[in-house]
A protein has these predicted regions:
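Edge beta-strand at a domain terminus
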Residues: 133-165, 209-214, 251-273
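Bacterial Sec-dependent N-terminal signal peptides
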Residues: 1, 15-42, 143-158, 265-273
């Protein structure tokens, strides 16, 4: 798990810069496809690292829009043991040479990150790659990892469909409840409101928070909020679907022993008076 934390942290470093370069590396040469840049167009999410599933908290979304431009969305907080990052479609420059991609980031005058992807297979729904990452600080290697990674393509984008007021109808997995006492109202500006029932059974906005923000990229939902005099908190979910007035989220979570479990949360849209 720590290995992926390092990968996610390094990926976040990319988002602090817009330097994307390509190199030729003859390690494990393959010919996964012609016109790689064209096949990459769209949104992609990492789902397996070295054959192990990636938990939702550590996922991100890469969006390739051309042969020279890409975006990345990722949320990492201090509780994950890494640098705090909140990037909603951070623009990146992209260069591709054959089946090789190398991401190079000079995040500051001391730190350089080089991330290499040697793509071994790609089709319309997934791609796999041999992956190397090296982070140096003042010329000294601080991190080096190698492994295999699999991305799957996201076919839907729920940024517009999530706008509105939603009431939670139940949570399963890890903990289960159905008290009908949670509402979230998502706005187009990337903020949201949280509602609870008061003692009289009336819906009341929670006003003890300094801020509440979210973003959706494809089906990846990230939220963050901060209560007065408390640390910032975050959540990560994957939107399964939004169909008319029904919405479902899922998330793969990790236990302290490294095992995983899935959570499912169902929502119903509320039409405001």
């Amino acid at each position: 798990m720590k290995k992926f934390l390092s990968w996610a942290f390094a990926a976040a470093l990319i988002c602090s810069s817009t330097v994307f370069t390509s190199c030729v590396n003859e390690d494990n040469p393959v010919n996964p496809a012609d016109n790689l840049a064209e096949k990459l167009i769209g949104k992609w999410m990492p789902v397996y690292l070295d054959g192990n599933p990636v938990v939702t908290d550590l996922k991100s979304v890469y969006t390739f829009v051309s042969a020279t431009k890409a975006y990345m969305s990722v949320s990492i907080n201090a509780q994950q043991g890494e640098e705090i990052v909140w990037n909603n479609q951070k623009e990146l420059d992209l260069s591709i040479n054959g089946n090789k991609m190398t991401l190079t980031n000079h995040s500051d005058e001391h730190t350089t990150m080089v991330e290499e992807f040697n793509i071994t297979a790609i089709d319309g729904s997934a791609f796999t790659a041999n992956h190397k990452i090296t982070v140096t600080v003042d010329g000294s290697v601080m991190l080096h990892n190698e492994g295999t990674i699999r991305f799957e393509k996201l076919t839907r984008d729920y940024r517009e469909a999530i706008i509105g007021l939603w009431e939670c109808k139940g949570l399963k997995g890890g903990e289960t409840y159905n008290d009908g006492n949670d509402r979230l109202e998502f706005f187009e500006d990337g903020t949201y409101k949280y509602w609870r029932k008061n003692d009289a059974g009336e819906w009341e906005e929670v006003t003890t928070r300094e801020f509440q923000e979210y973003f959706v990229d494809g089906g990846f939902l990230c939220t963050r909020w901060k209560n007065v005099d408390e640390d910032e908190l975050r959540e990560w979910w994957e939107i399964v679907n939004i169909k008319r007035d029904k919405m479902q989220w899922k998330a793969l979570r990790a236990n302290e022993d490294g095992s995983t479990f899935e959570q499912i949360m169902d929502w119903e849209k509320i039409e405001e008076d």
